[in-house]
Amino acid sequence: MVGGLERYYQLARVFRDEDPRADRAYGEATQIDIELSFTSQDEVLNLVESMFIALVRDVFPEKYLTKIPFPRIPYAEALKKYQTEKPDLRQNKDDPNELAFCFIVDWPLFEWNKEERRWDPNHHIFTAPKPEHVRLIDTDPGRAHSLQHDFVLNGFEIAGGSIRITDPAVQEKIFELVGIKKEEGRHKFQHMLEAFSFGVPPHGGIAIGLDRMLIPLLGETNLREVIAFPKTGDGRDLMVGAPSSLSEQKLRELGIEVIKEKTSPKNKQTKKR
């Protein structure tokens, strides 16, 4: 966006160090990442809404939508009313053809880290605060809300994104608040802060989890049912036998040394006499 592209999307293969669960594969996912310049949160959400209305109409004609337009629910209201930030708004949860989409908006910008006694970003450090809440970064960070948005379908979070910060002064304030010192921030993000100082278009976007999106659309309950060659719970691919051990020769060719884990005396089992 800083480089002058007004709109772009990509199909991104994402690798993360995360534990698997019903709606998340072991360490990997496929996303449709959408980014727009000269945009607003409303424009991003309107784009996603129109895209999914067309998707359901053209690809899943047997299904129907609970509400149009899709509800936009503040984060605090979702927790108070549904006790979750991923509410399932279907009127009949036994109907496999009902699709209830909603957006969760107005998220807290920060959350308090009790262990380290500092503020952490609720989403990421580049998420823009609501314009009227910029002043709260200095005075009352816990009350500041952001331009973050999540997209939920039948109780599954299928997308998330935000509008980004474009003011270098605001960005440096947030760096400092979350424990990134000014010198460190300028060293790590100098290219970005310098670009911001020349002016950058307001921009933002959303990333749609392609695999996760298919779970409710196809009437499944687990991600393994909608992806090819799903891995086991401990990350093994039974189809190709991966991961596997490298031979000593391959390790030498690659310059890799395997360091065996030392067993502490506490973990050693002692036989009873």
Protein language model annotation of sequence segments:
Residues 1-273:
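Class II aminoacyl-tRNA synthetase catalytic cores and aaRS-like
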